[in-house]
């Protein structure tokens, strides 16, 4: 798109927010000249590291190359001083999987049409040297709400550029959709996308994935072995041609795996009217509803964790925690979030800051409790402490669910029925008359948010109930309350969807219990029982590297952990153990990340970053020192000051981290250095390296390095 000005605000009018991430926000925008609507991804580049910024540039570069009817198109990319604007197609149809469950009719032939469009987009990407690497339901959208709208492939944040002579190393993708070669840390290329297509096609046909386990190690073992099957009765009605296509996509050996172009020529796809079954698959739709609900629940929980970590909305007015009327404890927000206490704003003193996941014990019919952080109400009593519990409750007699909101004095507010057509006497509990006006106002605001964040059908049904009850619904939530509560209300809505889909005893079962129930699918339940790893929605992008022929270039990568987790255990000892394990894992990840940053600085000849990450008295044993122990970093300045023009790419393979106490760590790894010599010839060099890190003044610095390899010559590159 050609614009007279390179300034975003000169070309576009910004409208409402469509979505939000840690460092970006997506807003609807209108082009001032044409009046066309787009979706603008606005990235705050001040918050990005150098590695993140290179990832952003790579994504924009790839998206500019791709113009296909089944790919969300990038129309404009504008870089300003503090923000980068990516202007995409405005895709209004929502997720493909959500649309399927709303259809009145869905057959194997429909699944064939869906996967055909996905394969068309992948074939186009591969023909242009692009590997997506993150194919999953969340990235499959519909162009509009119209019937028969095109499927659009989105999110090229993990995509890479390759050619037929290149292969990549690096752990990137989403666990449930990762290919065996990625998990085995073998070189990989375009076939990884076909494997993910096979997983998606399997889900499209029966509503659950081929590989599942609550334990991620066992999940990975299943994938590496290609251990999946076609259980009865749901697979009995699927044609052999569909199963054959899945088998060709889920072939463990990537060299024998079918390509996108070959898959498009399979009769089940190109002649679906003759080959694919046209029988309605109600069991698949029912199962897919539950699959979607679990995905949304995990995504919402991840959003809550992201809010508590990144947004800074958690504020506390009570550092010691408070005891609720039922005897349970609501912990201090800074303790729950793992952050320091923040001063409260005037608005935060009147309204609850954020809903926190709380594993308190509630009645058996409670699906999930979410409790607001305590706050003081200055208008009524400086000593009066209030907080709410927002939960879904399932009637034991009717199995119907509804939203229930109660405060710490056991007053009940707005038990709006959201998932059935009628409200039973059990569900029509009237609000207590003892609640204060401030409390009722907040209850109204929270209930408003729940209604607006629910699906349109739920919203209409709920608003009708409100109208019939002659309740006053003019109170709306203030902006700061909406910003803080929306992610958690999404969790509650997703939880309610699970309850309405008859996922029994979710509150009473631990994640492992649920996993065992799902694994015993054939014996215990109908084909609508879902199966999915608790980690399958977590996206990973770790230590990418390019290997092979062609021009070598320095590529930075970033570890992205969305942190989706299962249900929190109420056992203190279990929670402490999990917390300790999580902290240790996070520390190890930090060491790997800072080591990769140091290697990147060496490759880029960035002496400023190098000195920031190394202690001034760092010692080293390395071939360049001819066996001598060198102290200080000045010895290495020569390699930065030299006028080296070689293009260098460094990869850290198989890092092994040992945490030593609280302030020290050691990492050992194999370093692969790829470069072009002065004649343009490619070389690869391998060495074994270990680094000792020490935490000083809250940051990690390298205090010792030991490397084993042959000394550098004029045809190679120093690897210090």
Swiss-Prot record:
<dbReference type="Pfam" id="PF00069">
    <property type="entry name" value="Pkinase"/>
</dbReference>
<keyword id="KW-0460">Magnesium</keyword>
<dbReference type="InterPro" id="IPR017441">
    <property type="entry name" value="Protein_kinase_ATP_BS"/>
</dbReference>
<comment type="function">
    <text>Acts in the signaling of a variety of pathways and processes. Phosphorylates 'Ser-319' of daf-16 in response to stress signals, such as heat, starvation and oxidation, which plays a role in prolonging lifespan. Required for viability under chronic osmotic stress in which it acts downstream of osr-1. Has roles in locomotion, oocyte maturation, brood size, egg laying, defecation, meiotic maturation and neuronal cell fate specification. Required for the regulation of synaptic density and neuromuscular junction morphology. Regulates the synaptic trafficking of glr-1.</text>
</comment>
<keyword id="KW-0723">Serine/threonine-protein kinase</keyword>
<keyword id="KW-0963">Cytoplasm</keyword>
<protein>
    <recommendedName>
        <fullName>Calcium/calmodulin-dependent protein kinase type II</fullName>
        <ecNumber>2.7.11.17</ecNumber>
    </recommendedName>
</protein>
<dbReference type="GO" id="GO:0042802">
    <property type="term" value="F:identical protein binding"/>
</dbReference>
<feature type="binding site">
    <location>
        <position position="41"/>
    </location>
    <ligand>
        <name>ATP</name>
    </ligand>
</feature>
<dbReference type="GO" id="GO:0004683">
    <property type="term" value="F:calcium/calmodulin-dependent protein kinase activity"/>
</dbReference>
<keyword id="KW-0479">Metal-binding</keyword>
<keyword id="KW-0067">ATP-binding</keyword>
<dbReference type="GO" id="GO:0005516">
    <property type="term" value="F:calmodulin binding"/>
</dbReference>
<feature type="compositionally biased region" description="Polar residues">
    <location>
        <begin position="526"/>
        <end position="540"/>
    </location>
</feature>
<feature type="active site" description="Proton acceptor">
    <location>
        <position position="134"/>
    </location>
</feature>
<dbReference type="GO" id="GO:0014069">
    <property type="term" value="C:postsynaptic density"/>
</dbReference>
<dbReference type="GO" id="GO:0010628">
    <property type="term" value="P:positive regulation of gene expression"/>
</dbReference>
<dbReference type="Pfam" id="PF08332">
    <property type="entry name" value="CaMKII_AD"/>
</dbReference>
<dbReference type="GO" id="GO:0048168">
    <property type="term" value="P:regulation of neuronal synaptic plasticity"/>
</dbReference>
<dbReference type="GO" id="GO:0072375">
    <property type="term" value="P:medium-term memory"/>
</dbReference>
<dbReference type="GO" id="GO:0042427">
    <property type="term" value="P:serotonin biosynthetic process"/>
</dbReference>
<feature type="binding site">
    <location>
        <begin position="18"/>
        <end position="26"/>
    </location>
    <ligand>
        <name>ATP</name>
    </ligand>
</feature>
<dbReference type="InterPro" id="IPR011009">
    <property type="entry name" value="Kinase-like_dom_sf"/>
</dbReference>
<dbReference type="GO" id="GO:0005524">
    <property type="term" value="F:ATP binding"/>
</dbReference>
<dbReference type="InterPro" id="IPR013543">
    <property type="entry name" value="Ca/CaM-dep_prot_kinase-assoc"/>
</dbReference>
<dbReference type="InterPro" id="IPR008271">
    <property type="entry name" value="Ser/Thr_kinase_AS"/>
</dbReference>
<feature type="domain" description="Protein kinase">
    <location>
        <begin position="12"/>
        <end position="269"/>
    </location>
</feature>
<dbReference type="GO" id="GO:1903076">
    <property type="term" value="P:regulation of protein localization to plasma membrane"/>
</dbReference>
<dbReference type="GO" id="GO:0106310">
    <property type="term" value="F:protein serine kinase activity"/>
</dbReference>
<comment type="subunit">
    <text>Dodecamer. Subunits are tightly packed around a central ring-shaped scaffold with extensive contacts between the regulatory segment of one kinase and the catalytic domain of another enabling cooperative activation of a subunit by the adjacent molecule. Interacts with and phosphorylates daf-16; the interaction promotes daf-16 nuclear localization. Interacts with egl-2 and tir-1. Interacts with nsy-1.</text>
</comment>
<keyword id="KW-0547">Nucleotide-binding</keyword>
<dbReference type="GO" id="GO:0046872">
    <property type="term" value="F:metal ion binding"/>
</dbReference>
<keyword id="KW-0112">Calmodulin-binding</keyword>
<dbReference type="GO" id="GO:0043005">
    <property type="term" value="C:neuron projection"/>
</dbReference>
<dbReference type="InterPro" id="IPR032710">
    <property type="entry name" value="NTF2-like_dom_sf"/>
</dbReference>
<feature type="region of interest" description="Disordered">
    <location>
        <begin position="317"/>
        <end position="345"/>
    </location>
</feature>
<feature type="compositionally biased region" description="Low complexity">
    <location>
        <begin position="569"/>
        <end position="586"/>
    </location>
</feature>
<keyword id="KW-0597">Phosphoprotein</keyword>
<comment type="similarity">
    <text>Belongs to the protein kinase superfamily. CAMK Ser/Thr protein kinase family. CaMK subfamily.</text>
</comment>
<dbReference type="GO" id="GO:0044325">
    <property type="term" value="F:transmembrane transporter binding"/>
</dbReference>
<keyword id="KW-0966">Cell projection</keyword>
<feature type="region of interest" description="Disordered">
    <location>
        <begin position="504"/>
        <end position="586"/>
    </location>
</feature>
């Amino acid at each position: 798109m050609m614009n007279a000005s390179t300034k975003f605000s000169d070309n576009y009018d910004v409208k409402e927010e469509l979505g939000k991430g840690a460092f970006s926000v997506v807003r609807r925008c209108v082009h001032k000249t044409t009046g066309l609507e787009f979706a603008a991804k606005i990235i705050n580049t001040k918050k990005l590291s150098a590695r993140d910024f290179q990832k952003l540039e790579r994504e924009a570069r790839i998206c500019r190359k791709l113009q296909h009817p089944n790919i969300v198109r990038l129309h404009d990319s504008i870089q300003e001083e503090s923000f980068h604007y990516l202007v995409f197609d405005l895709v209004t149809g929502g997720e493909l999987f959500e649309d399927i469950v709303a259809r009145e009719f869905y057959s194997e032939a429909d699944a064939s049409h869906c996967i055909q469009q996905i394969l068309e987009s992948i074939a186009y990407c591969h023909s242009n040297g692009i590997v997506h690497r993150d194919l999953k339901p969340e990235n499959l959208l519909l162009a509009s709400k119209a019937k028969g709208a095109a499927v659009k492939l989105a999110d090229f944040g993990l995509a890479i550029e390759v050619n037929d002579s290149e292969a990549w190393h690096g752990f990137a993708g989403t666990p449930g959709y990762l290919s065996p070669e990625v998990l085995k840390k073998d070189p990989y290329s375009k076939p990884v996308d076909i494997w993910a297509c096979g997983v998606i096609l399997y889900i499209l046909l029966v509503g659950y994935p081929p590989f599942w386990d609550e334990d991620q190690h066992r999940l990975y073992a299943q994938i590496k072995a290609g251990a999946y099957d076609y259980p009865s009765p749901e697979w009995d009605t699927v044609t052999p041609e569909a199963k054959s296509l899945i088998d060709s996509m889920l072939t463990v050996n990537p060299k024998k795996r079918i390509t996108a172009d070959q898959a498009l020529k399979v009769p089940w796809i190109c002649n679906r009217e003759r080959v694919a079954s046209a029988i309605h698959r109600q069991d698949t739709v029912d199962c897919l509803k539950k699959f979607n609900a679990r995905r949304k629940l995990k995504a919402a929980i991840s959003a809550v964790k992201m809010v508590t970590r990144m947004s800074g909305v958690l504020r506390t007015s009570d550092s010691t925690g408070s005891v609720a009327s039922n005897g349970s404890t609501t912990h201090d927000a800074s303790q729950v979030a793992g952050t320091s206490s923040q001063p409260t704003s005037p608005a935060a003193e009147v309204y609850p800051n954020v809903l926190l996941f709380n594993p308190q014990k509630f009645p058996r019919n409670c699906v999930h409790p979410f409790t607001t952080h305590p706050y003081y109400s200055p208008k009524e009593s400086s000593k009066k402490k209030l907080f709410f519990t927002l939960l879904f409750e399932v009637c034991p007699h009717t199995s119907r669910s509804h939203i229930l909101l109660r405060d710490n004095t056991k007053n009940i507010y707005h038990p709006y029925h959201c998932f059935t057509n009628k409200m039973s006497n059990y569900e029509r509990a009237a609000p207590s008359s003892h609640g204060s006006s401030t409390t009722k106002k907040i209850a109204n605001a929270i209930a408003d948010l729940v209604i607006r964040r629910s699906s349109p059908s739920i919203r209409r049904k709920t608003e009708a109930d409100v109208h019939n009850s002659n309740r006053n619904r003019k109170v709306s939530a203030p902006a700061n309350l909406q910003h803080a509560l929306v992610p958690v209300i999404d969790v509650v809505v997703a939880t309610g969807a699970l309850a309405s889909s008859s996922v029994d005893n979710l509150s009473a079962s631990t994640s492992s219990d649920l996993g065992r129930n799902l694994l015993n699918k054939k014996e215990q339940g109908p084909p609508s029982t879902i199966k999915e790893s608790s980690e399958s929605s977590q996206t990973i992008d770790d230590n990418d590297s390019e290997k092979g022929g062609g021009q070598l270039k320095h590529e930075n990568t970033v570890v992205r952990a969305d942190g989706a987790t299962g249900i929190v255990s109420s056992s203190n000892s279990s929670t402490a153990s999990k917390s300790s394990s999580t902290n240790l894992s996070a520390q190890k990840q930090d060491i790997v990340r800072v080591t990769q940053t140091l290697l990147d600085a060496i490759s880029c000849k960035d002496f400023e970053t190098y000195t920031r990450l190394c202690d001034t008295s760092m010692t080293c044993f390395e071939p360049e020192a001819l066996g001598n122990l060198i102290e200080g970093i000045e010895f290495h300045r020569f390699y930065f000051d030299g006028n080296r023009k070689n293009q260098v790419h460094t990869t850290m393979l198989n890092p092994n981290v040992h945490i030593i106490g609280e302030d020290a760590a050691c990492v050992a790894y194999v370093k692969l250095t790829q470069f072009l010599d002065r004649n343009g010839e490619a070389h690869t060099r391998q060495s074994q390296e270990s680094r000792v890190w020490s935490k000083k003044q809250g940051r990690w610095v390298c205090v010792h390095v030991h490397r084993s390899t042959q000394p550098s010559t004029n045809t190679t590159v120093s690897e210090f």
